[in-house]
Regions:
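Generic structural signal for well-ordered alpha-helices
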Residues: 103-107, 157
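Histidine-centered active-site loop/cap adjacent to the catalytic His
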Residues: 196-238
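Sec-exported extracytoplasmic/periplasmic mature domains
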Residues: 84, 108-115, 161, 165, ...
Length: 238
C-alpha cells in the first residue's frame, strides 16, 4: 500500500498479514481511499532503496562488525532504536508477538557482536489527535478508529517496556518513553479549515496520521538526545 509521497521518494507499508520484503510495482498507482493526493501516479522506472544499512547479503543477516569495519569504527558502545509505527494497524491491539520476535532478534545480535553495548528502546509517539487518521485512512478499515489506534500505541509501548525489563534483556537494555515527550496536538501536519460552511472561524485539522512535521521529528530527536546525555552522565547505568 502506498503510504506517503515525498519528493523523488514513495513510501510503502505492507497490507494486513503481508510480510514480503519488497512490493510489486506496476506502471501506475491508482488512488483508492484516504490521503490528500488523489491523482494517478505514472511509474516509468523504479529501484528499491536498501532500508537496512547493517544487512550483509553474503550471510543474509545483520552484520554489525562488518558495518563498523567499513566505516572505521572500533565498536559500538551505545545503541538507540526507535521501533516505529509500522505494522500497528489493529485497533486496541494487545498482541505484538510478530514485533517482539524481530526486536529480540535485533537486540540479541547486537549483544552477541558487542557484549558491552548498552541498548535503549525508544517507544512510539501518539498519532494525530485532530483528524490525521481520517485524512490518511478514511472512516473505515485499519487505522480508522482513532481511539483504538491510540490505545494500540499505549499497549505497544507497554510491551516494549516489559521486554526491556525482562530477565532476558534487563542487564543491557532499557526503555525510554517517547509519547510523554512528544506533542501530538501541535507537532503533526495540519491545515486551517472553517469549522463549518456558515462560519469564518477556523480550526486546525490534521492531515497525516502518524508522520510528524519536521519540528515533530526534531522533538523525537530531543528524546534521543536526553537519553544520550543521561547515558554519558551516568556511565550507561539504567
Amino acid at each position: 500500500i502506498l503510504e506517503s509521497i515525498e519528493e523523488k521518494r514513495l513510501k510503502f507499508k505492507r497490507g494486513n498479514l503481508n510480510y514480503t520484503p519488497t512490493p510489486k510495482i506496476g506502471d501506475k498507482f491508482i488512488h483508492v481511499s484516504g490521503g490528500i493526493h488523489h491523482e494517478d501516479i505514472i511509474v516509468n522506472k523504479y529501484e528499491f532503496e536498501m532500508g537496512n544499512p547493517f544487512w550483509n547479503k553474503a550471510i543474509e543477516n545483520n552484520d554489525f562488525k562488518t558495518y563498523c569495519s567499513k566505516y572505521g569504527y572500533e565498536g559500538i558502545d551505545l545503541v538507540y532504536v526507535l521501533l516505529s509505527w509500522n505494522g500497528q494497524y489493529i485497533p486496541y491491539n494487545t498482541n505484538f508477538d510478530h514485533h517482539t520476535i524481530y526486536a529480540k532478534k535485533l537486540m540479541t545480535q547486537i549483544h552477541e557482536a558487542y557484549p558491552n553495548a548498552h541498548i535503549t528502546l525508544l517507544g512510539i509517539q501518539i498519532c494525530s489527535v485532530n483528524g490525521g487518521i481520517g485524512a490518511n485512512y478514511g472512516a473505515s478499515g485499519y487505522y480508522s478508529d482513532e481511539f483504538g489506534t491510540i490505545t494500540t500505541a499505549f499497549n505497544y509501548n507497554k510491551c516494549l517496556e516489559e521486554l526491556a525489563n525482562s530477565d532476558e534483556f534487563k542487564d543491557y537494555v532499557r526503555y525510554v518513553d517517547t509519547k510523554a515527550q512528544f506533542d501530538s496536538e501541535y507537532n503533526m501536519p495540519m491545515i486551517l479549515k472553517k469549522v463549518n460552511t456558515r462560519s469564518t472561524i477556523t480550526e486546525y485539522i490534521g492531515t497525516n496520521a502518524v508522520h510528524p512535521t519536521l519540528n515533530g521529528y526534531l522533538q523525537i530527536g530531543d528524546v534521543f538526545y536526553r537519553a544520550l546525555v543521561r547515558d554519558i552522565v551516568d556511565g550507561n547505568k539504567k
